[in-house]
């Protein structure tokens, strides 16, 4: 039961969700198995049930900028099975993105950041317990909650008064995205008062991998947009959401680059990507290797997007139905600094993976696989630049 994981202390305003490795769902459902459940939610994990119930509660309380019900969805004809969804309200009502001009841009306390969110937007904070069997425990383990209060920003010489929850060490805050892309859309962030810029860290990457394993739903996705890759807030966070549709990229074929690291290259897709694969048993080393790549891209001032999803082992071939592992796709791309939003969709983590939140009815009606590919190609690195980057990354990872 999800209630066994949640602890709300009398003095706290935010609940804790405690978990351990015993809660990971290593044997994921295939999409065929998922469809057999239809509307039956008994397959969901305690994490799924807790997250979804809290998210729906906050939707019913009117804490989002717009209600998100059943989005009009269609699968585009073609070999790539793009999932297009009409989400007009997000394009109209979302918060104006921060002015970004560099992948290495420092945190700015004067811009909007997550120290300024409403306390009611917090779902819970997640704490990894060292207890081996969190599910069977009568007591939820984890750090205590300080509650809401005023604190100083902890980022070097930056000073900012902020009204936020101070997380104990090792916790991750789960906050609703008030302009949701899909059902269950939340943000995962380390202690906001650390005031970290939008540059991926090993700890947050590790949590992203763990969160996918905590979910029993094959459609639970986690992602990251770098600065210049359509990150709208320069304050460290991941996106998490449910998309109840199979994506081509979950089982697409790949070429091994560093087999010893499960590092591959996907080229049979409009947006070539670097791919890490794990069966879930080596999460820490996988997170470290992923951040070696993203740190390399940051150092080279290359914008990037990252998408974490359950998927098949790339060594088993194209089109496998198995979803027992995790695929992490990383796209290096042209930066979007000052880009005008003139296309049917922005090209960020969802769109590169094959999920297309479309801004208006006209584009939704007319969109085709070919038009999607044209839009995406305009955001990619030149072929020779990408080829050289691939060679440089392999050399760097093998040092």
Swiss-Prot record:
It catalyses: GDP-alpha-D-glucose + phosphate = alpha-D-glucose 1-phosphate + GDP + H(+). The keyword Nucleotidyltransferase applies. Disulfide bonds: none annotated. GO terms for cellular component: cytoplasm. GO terms for biological process: glucose metabolic process. Transmembrane segments: none annotated. Specific and highly efficient GDP-D-glucose phosphorylase regulating the levels of GDP-D-glucose in cells. InterPro entries: GDPGP. Its EC number is 2.7.7.78. One of its GO terms (molecular function) is hydrolase activity. Keywords: Cytoplasm, Guanine-nucleotide releasing factor, Hydrolase, Nucleotide-binding, Nucleotidyltransferase, Transferase. The active site is at 237 (tele-gmp-histidine intermediate). It is found in: Cytoplasm. It comes from the Eukaryota. Its main location: cytoplasm. This is GDP-D-glucose phosphorylase 1. Belongs to the GDPGP1 family. It is an enzyme of class 2 (transferase).
